[in-house]
């Protein structure tokens, strides 16, 4: 009885090993095939963009018209908030960004807060 169990175990191990080896062979061949296909494809050459200084594929650099690139660059800056309009400050006369928020010191903040919360009484 024990001999038949031993034979059954060895048979099952050999079947498992065969299946594992076949999986391993299939996987390695597939990965080798993908590697050779991937390495045979043409690699893009990279060119630096004169406006931004970033490297991009040469085909994309050739296709972009300089006007379109400049326009999209300005639009990107405006979306990020980097494009600023400068206007003269009415109090100081110096130029500052249009979206500049005037800084308030602690005394001004305190007075604004207390004036809002105080009740006014009408004396008649």
UniProtKB/Swiss-Prot annotation:
Domain of life from the UniProt record: Eukaryota
Q: Keyword Transit peptide: yes or no?
A: yes
Q: Which GO terms describe its cellular component?
A: mitochondrion
Transit peptide residues according to the UniProt entry = 1-35
The UniProt entry, under InterPro entries, shows: LEA_3a
Return any one Pfam family short name.
LEA_3a
Q: Where in the cell is it found?
A: Mitochondrion
**Where is the major localization of this protein?**
mitochondrion
Which keywords accompany this UniProt record? Mitochondrion, Transit peptide
**Membrane-crossing residue ranges in chain numbering:** none
Cysteine-cysteine disulfides: none
Q: Which family does it belong to?
A: Belongs to the LEA type 3 family.
| Protein's UniProt name | Late embryogenesis abundant protein 37
* High-level lineage: Eukaryota, Viridiplantae, Streptophyta, Embryophyta, Tracheophyta
């Amino acid at each position: 009885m024990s001999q038949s169990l031993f034979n059954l175990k060895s048979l099952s191990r050999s079947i498992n090993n065969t299946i594992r080896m076949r999986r391993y062979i299939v996987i390695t061949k597939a990965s080798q095939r993908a590697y050779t296909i991937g390495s045979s494809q043409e690699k893009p050459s990279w060119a630096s963009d004169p406006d931004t200084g970033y490297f991009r594929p040469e085909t994309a650099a050739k296709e972009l018209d300089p006007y379109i690139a400049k326009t999209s660059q300005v639009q990107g800056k405006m979306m990020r908030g980097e494009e600023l309009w400068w206007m003269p400050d009415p109090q100081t006369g110096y130029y500052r960004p249009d979206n500049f928020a005037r800084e308030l010191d602690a005394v001004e903040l305190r007075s604004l807060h207390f004036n809002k919360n105080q009740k006014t009484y009408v004396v008649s």
